[in-house]
């Protein structure tokens, strides 16, 4: 959030902080969640770039559309392993995976 927006919200009595602070997450928990969100976003972006529906991707992964939806939403039941394997099945290289992890908008 931009500084001006934070100031404006604080001036109106809103408490401005991070999700990490709000949820009381440790640094490790916060990093894990951020990694999962980046991979999930990367999966959605790559699927859309390939012109696939969630159902198409589910068939490719021998899974269900609802499972793909959970993967793209970063659902807690989805493992990092499954997200990475799914990205690889869509043709993501090691370099592209590292770009997704470093910068979610890069890949």
Language-model region placement:
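N-terminal flexible/basic segments that precede or flank functional cores
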Residues: 1-38, 99-107
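Short basic helix-loop element that most often maps to the first helix and adjoining turn
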Residues: 12, 41-56, 85
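Alpha-helix N-cap/N′ positions at the starts of helices
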Residues: 38-39, 63
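Short alpha-helical DNA-recognition segment
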Residues: 51-70
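Residue-level detection of the helix-turn-helix DNA-binding "recognition helix"
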Residues: 62, 73-75, 102
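Alpha-helical DNA-recognition elements
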Residues: 70, 74, 85
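DNA major-groove recognition helix of helix-turn-helix/homeodomain DNA-binding modules
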Residues: 79-97
């Amino acid at each position: 959030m931009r500084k001006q927006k934070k100031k404006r919200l604080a001036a109106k009595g809103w408490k401005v902080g991070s999700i990490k602070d709000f949820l009381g997450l440790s640094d490790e928990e916060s990093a894990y969640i951020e990694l999962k969100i980046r991979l999930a976003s990367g999966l959605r972006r790559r699927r859309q770039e390939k012109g696939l529906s969630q159902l198409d991707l589910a068939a490719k992964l021998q899974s269900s559309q609802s499972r793909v939806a959970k993967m793209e939403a970063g659902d807690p039941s989805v493992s990092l392993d499954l997200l990475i394997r799914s990205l690889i099945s869509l043709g993501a290289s090691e370099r592209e995976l590292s770009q997704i992890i470093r910068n979610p908008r890069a890949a």
